[in-house]
Amino acid sequence: MNTSGDPAQTGPEGCRGTMSAEEDARWLRWVTQQFKTIAGEDGEISLQEFKAALHVKESFFAERFFALFDSDRSGTITLQELQEALTLLIHGSPMDKLKFLFQVYDIDVCARQGASAGTEWGAGAGPHWASSPLGTGSGSIDPDELRTVLQSCLRESAISLPDEKLDQLTLALFESADADGNGAITFEELRDELQRFPGVMENLTISAAHWLTAPAPRPRPRRPRQLTRAYWHNHRSQLFCLATYAGLHVLLFGLAASAHRDLGASVMVAKGCGQCLNFDCSFIAVLMLRRCLTWLRATWLAQVLPLDQNIQFHQLMGYVVVGLSLVHTVAHTVNFVLQAQAEASPFQFWELLLTTRPGIGWVHGSASPTGVALLLLLLLMFICSSSCIRRSGHFEVFYWTHLSYLLVWLLLIFHGPNFWKWLLVPGILFFLEKAIGLAVSRMAAVCIMEVNLLPSKVTHLLIKRPPFFHYRPGDYLYLNIPTIARYEWHPFTISSAPEQKDTIWLHIRSQGQWTNRLYESFKASDPLGRGSKRLSRSVTMRKSQRSSKGSEILLEKHKFCNIKCYIDGPYGTPTRRIFASEHAVLIGAGIGITPFASILQSIMYRHQKRKHTCPSCQHSWIEGVQDNMKLHKVDFIWINRDQRSFEWFVSLLTKLEMDQAEEAQYGRFLELHMYMTSALGKNDMKAIGLQMALDLLANKEKKDSITGLQTRTQPGRPDWSKVFQKVAAEKKGKVQVFFCGSPALAKVLKGHCEKFGFRFFQENF
């Protein structure tokens, strides 16, 4: 081993072939910089510093890695030791990485290596795991060692399994790797086992140690995707509406300004902005006519108008209103300054700006004071509508300040002589819809029949379904529970299928004040009320333990109750288009599964309706599709951070898999894809053994050890390029992607959809 620290010459095979000289030098500079940051003043890395830098959850791996990096057994790692070890581990050959992995798994090797320190692996000998004979330790991995490693892998990936399942995983991997059946896994046997997984050996790394690899150089700036042909094609309806909106503003501004050109530039600007505000402040209500928009979704206009972006257009128009109001105010202020400075002016500046004495305006000269009040109200609504307030547990602040739109409209009627004409039709529609919604919701006083408290603070409500409440898969409703907050209505996606006649399901994630109070109230022994009679009539509370087919035993709380609530809806969403698609890709992140749960259940009910059994011979068959469903294929992708979140809908997914198994002869209509982001993948040395064992046991038992489903849960995040390539290669018809989840992931998916020519629809709240 070369002790000069030149990584180009280290290792039995060298690693210059994997790195250019420039990359080599840049990587060494990066490692040196990170080493100095971690090591501190003493210039060496201790075990505790190594653990903190590695960001591993399980100290087992940190201790194993540290022992193998510390070639001189000094109890600390020097810069030279770190460089030599990482050169082989990060940029070395597959055999170098495999030797390291074997030493990690051969637990008793370190004790024996420590006894021989100073002989074979003396100081300056380089990484002992790369140059020493494998037989220095025990030279093999026994079942107890493998079980210890797999147990640490489980903790590292935040997976909890019972001891019996851990024993089964250990046995499955050990029996597969121990080719000669002598009760121990040798280096050659581990190598042969890994070679069954293509690409794993070449890509083995320690993913959690982000400080091991230098940041990639910035890529060359590419053309913004907004300027690509695919973007313009996929967003043509939105772009057309934006162009029409901008053109209308130019027209309104120009007409109003030209009509007052004799009064000066400031008045022209003020009048132009005022005319645009007449339109914006009235039409902004049209974008929130949920019943009208739901009705339009069922017409041909849904193919022309961007109905799914109504909330984004509402927000955009809100920004425009605030901007125009500021310009309008500044222009009038400049005009008042000029008037007050005129010799013949009987009014001072503050009188023109704040009083009714000048007689400016339609009603008792109130234009100036109402204008100031309007600007303050609009700024308040604008600030309280920001995402940092709405999504940080202060939704009530947004809700109550947004109700001041009623006062804004009233002040606008007093402020401008023509605003009432602009508001007449939109205002009638808006208040008519509000009146209908209020009447229907009060007539539809229903009750919460059952509550299930699920993992990750999710509340599952079962509400008695009114006989006239008709909805489609993926629709949402507004819920009001007077015992939580008398005047607050919150939107939630319906997670039950329309074919479910008796109840409506809602799955509510605790993320704000209202949802947290809902969960905590039912979690308490006296739900919703500290003994108040009108809050709850809980009949029974029972706790049941159930095993998720190999997953950990969960403790769920079920409460049967009779709590009065009100519902308003249903309202349509983009997911209504799913059954008109040919190949639908449903992507849910976390609780974003709720609209797709309704859709998947509806699919299950429709398939059950098509299934028939002969009463004589018990032969079963499935008729062709008799409804309007055009679907040829459905890919459902569910991404969760932790294991317990899969429990929300595991029973539904199990039933879907059973139905698919019965229809296997007709082709696989529905494919499930499950991803757990906290789990490490096969390319990570801290998880390769576990993932291999999970694969082997899943093939043996025909079910996943994490969820109990037949579908194998994949670790990490999806590789969207590979996922969409597979979807495109199936050629099942035009692909439409439906997503419900975080805006950050939506942006990523939107870019991939534009690349592959898929239509993208997002659930908005």
From Swiss-Prot:
Task: Give the GO terms filed under biological process for this record.
Answer: angiogenesis; apoptotic process; cytoskeleton-dependent cytokinesis; defense response; endothelial cell proliferation; positive regulation of cytokine production; positive regulation of reactive oxygen species metabolic process; proton transmembrane transport
Do you know what upregulates this one?
Down-regulated by TGFB1.
**Where does the signal peptide begin and end?**
none
Q: Which PROSITE patterns match?
A: EF_HAND_1, EF_HAND_2, FAD_FR
Residue ranges occupied by any Ferric oxidoreductase domain in the UniProt entry: 293-440
Keywords for this entry? Angiogenesis, Calcium, Cell membrane, Electron transport, Endoplasmic reticulum, FAD, Flavoprotein, Ion channel, Ion transport, Membrane, Metal-binding, NADP, Oxidoreductase, Repeat, Transmembrane, Transmembrane helix, Transport
Protein's UniProt keywords contain Transcription regulation: no
* Recorded superkingdom: Eukaryota
Q: Which residues bind Ca(2+) 2?
A: 70, 72, 74, 76, 81
Q: Where is the FAD-binding FR-type domain?
A: 441-577
User: What is the protein's given name?
Assistant: NADPH oxidase 5
Q: Which organism is it from?
A: Homo sapiens (Human)
